Design a protein with these regions (language model features):
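...captures the hydrophobic TM-helix bundle architecture rather than a specific catalytic motif
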Residues: 1-205
Length: 205
């Protein structure tokens, strides 16, 4: 969260001049969604609960949509924002399904409690663990623009340059990696999922 804050302060400082020639309403729109994104990213990184993580995850996608389409008179920018929005929503659906499955299995969405229950019950190879974690990884693939969802990221650069630097290079596209890190103590025990993640990471690279 500290790293997000430092990068965000740099972008905000640069943005002050970058959008200074815009109308007051457009300037307000830009700063509002930029501030909302930064707040959501910080809260996402601090969250120890999958439900709140999902909520902030959704705010990240929403802010990305509006900021990519900031130049809304540009048809290509509008199209790019729509493509990014729906592709990431597809991944969010898998994330939501994973939350339902995890909630039924563990009776909680607190990450520490889930990790503790996982080891106490010695169910590392259980399919009921592998499936929801795979669904979360699919959500990460879309948000992080990994193969086969890389199509939206180059298009997202139609938004303002500071937004491309903050959201689509430094923060949102690594939010999924941070989510996997939070659940890493479980994922590292799921051999099939580890291989799945390694394949997509290597192929995208």
């Amino acid at each position: 969260s500290l790293l997000v804050l430092i990068i965000s302060l740099c972008v905000i400082t640069y943005s002050y001049k970058y959008v200074s020639n815009e109308s007051k309403s457009r300037y307000f729109r830009y700063t509002f969604f930029l501030s909302l994104f930064i707040s959501s990213m910080i809260l996402f990184s601090l969250s120890n609960d999958l439900l709140s993580s999902f909520i902030f995850w959704e705010f990240l996608g929403l802010c990305s949509f509006f900021l990519i389409a900031f130049y809304n008179k540009d048809g290509e920018a509008n199209d790019s924002s729509i493509i990014a929005f729906w592709l990431t929503r597809l991944g969010d659906l898998f994330f939501l399904l994973a939350l339902v499955m995890i909630g039924f299995k563990y009776g909680t969405l607190n990450i520490d409690s889930i990790n503790n229950s996982f080891f106490q019950n010695s169910i590392a190879s259980s399919f009921s663990n592998t499936l929801p974690m795979t669904f979360i990884f699919i959500g990460v693939l879309t948000k992080c623009a990994q193969y086969p969802f890389t199509i939206w990221l180059p298009r997202a650069m139609k938004g303002p340059t500071p937004i491309s630097a903050l959201i689509h290079s430094a923060t949102m596209v690594v939010a999924g990696v941070f989510l996997l890190f939070k659940l890493g103590v479980i994922i590292i025990e799921l051999d099939s999922l580890k291989k799945f993640i390694m394949f997509f990471g290597a192929f995208t690279a």
